[in-house]
């Protein structure tokens, strides 16, 4: 009970502080109060580090190599502890766990090609990841191999976007550490499986990066892709809306009754945010 109360207080306090900062950064002046000033202080974190194509390619290759290394380690572990492993096909079958079977079925026969007693059980799984699997499978001709390589590549691409994102506000060392911590985090094992976690990570990282760069049409496109990966992808509309409010000082314009400018910014910039909600 006490833990729940303390957690609620911490969460709502954080929401309150974030709301104050959003309002302040959007151009709406609050009363001159020491407490409010302390809560809404905004330190500039702009980094002098500029990413290069060589760095991004290196991040992609290292991330992909890491996923391959984890895969090879898993093969060794399977041969050591599983007596039923007799070939590469048996190894691939070990990755057909949890939701992997459903994404495999969607990529293989579509949503209508599999049902249980007339119920299309795969309908709850979003389509973008199996679509990409099916495209990659045109080359490799094995959906299990195609799915794994798709996950590896998407994870590596996500690392590239996250590296670029962190480099906007932090130093190169911080960006590198962020990628390393992400890679060794226990949940990261799902980024190398036949599931769409890597797809959601990739599209979310791309969306957040373009939010910070204020490229709103790309925000809409990548945000829509995130929503096609998982339902939670639509939540990216929240940071997009916050950045739009802050960057263009919308509250300040509304306070000054500059409705024309607000409307112009909405239909030329902000309307792209709604693309991910459709």
Regions found by a protein language model. Give the residues of each.
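Start-transfer (signal-anchor) and selected internal transmembrane alpha helices
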Residues: 1-84, 272
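Membrane-lumen/periplasm interface segments of specific transmembrane helices
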Residues: 66-81, 95-96, 225-227, 233-278
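Transmembrane-helix motifs of polytopic, lipid-linked glycan transferases
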Residues: 133-135, 149-169
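Transmembrane-helix signature of polytopic, membrane-embedded enzymes
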Residues: 142-146, 162-184
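Short acidic/glycine- and proline-prone juxtamembrane loop motifs at membrane-interface regions
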Residues: 192-199
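Membrane-interface transmembrane helices that cradle and orient dolichyl/undecaprenyl
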Residues: 170-172, 207-218, 248
């Amino acid at each position: 009970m006490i833990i729940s109360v303390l957690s609620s207080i911490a969460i709502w306090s954080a929401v309150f502080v974030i709301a104050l900062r959003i309002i302040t950064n959007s151009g709406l002046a609050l009363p001159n109060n020491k407490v409010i000033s302390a809560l809404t202080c905004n330190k500039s974190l702009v980094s002098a580090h500029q990413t290069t194509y060589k760095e991004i390619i290196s991040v992609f290759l290292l991330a992909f190599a890491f996923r391959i290394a984890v895969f090879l380690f898993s093969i060794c572990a399977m041969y050591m502890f599983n007596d039923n492993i007799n070939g590469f096909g048996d190894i691939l079958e070990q990755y057909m766990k949890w939701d992997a079977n459903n994404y495999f079925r969607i990529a293989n026969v579509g949503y209508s090609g599999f049902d249980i007693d007339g119920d299309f059980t795969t309908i709850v799984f979003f389509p973008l990841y199996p679509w990409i699997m099916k495209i990659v499978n045109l080359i490799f001709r094995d959906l299990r191999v195609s799915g794994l390589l798709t996950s590896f590549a998407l994870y590596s691409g996500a690392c590239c976007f996250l590296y670029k994102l962190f480099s906007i506000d932090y130093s190169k060392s911080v960006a590198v550490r962020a990628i390393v911590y992400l890679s060794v985090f226990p949940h990261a094992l799902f980024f190398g499986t036949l599931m769409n976690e890597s797809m959601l990570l990739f599209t979310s990282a791309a969306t957040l990066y373009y939010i910070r760069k204020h490229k709103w049409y790309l925000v809409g496109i990548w945000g829509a892709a995130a929503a096609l990966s998982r339902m939670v992808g639509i939540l990216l509309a929240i940071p997009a809306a916050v950045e739009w409010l802050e960057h263009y000082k919308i509250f300040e314009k509304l306070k000054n009754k500059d409705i024309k400018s607000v409307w112009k910014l909405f239909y030329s910039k902000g309307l792209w945010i709604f693309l991910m909600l459709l």
